[in-house]
Amino acid sequence: MSTLKNTFFIAPPETPTQAGPDNIFYDFNNGARVLLPEGKWHVRLLDADSDNILFCCDVDKGWVTSSKKYFVRFRIQVFRQGEETPLLDETLKLKDRPVLISFPTGTLGDLLGWFPYAERFQALHKCQLECTMAQDIIDLLAPQYPQIQFSTP
């Protein structure tokens, strides 16, 4: 899996963070990501809000990742090929979960323009939001947003 290099953003973990059945690993960091062991698999990535299938494939081993890297309430389904019931069926649920929004450092206008949407995202999804940004911007915003955790990258 290629990693993000020379970027202002924090790269996702090298391996998906959630362990599923039969040594399947998945997460929703940087889109939907699934790492499959040797086997005969059928994978579906869906938009959980519209129930539209965004991607579907058969794979023997390796990675399946979404092309969409922005927020989509993904649903991941992994089947053994030929079976109708998914072995793994997970939908992104953010309530009470830690969520990191990584803002680039060295910018002010864009960050101030986008930050109200981060606050709205937290209110909508009821998540534990942490935002990374430059310390001088943290000093400006943190007193106004006590419900958000701030940190430097």
Residue map of PLM features:
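Catalytic machinery of carbohydrate-active enzymes
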Residues: 1-153
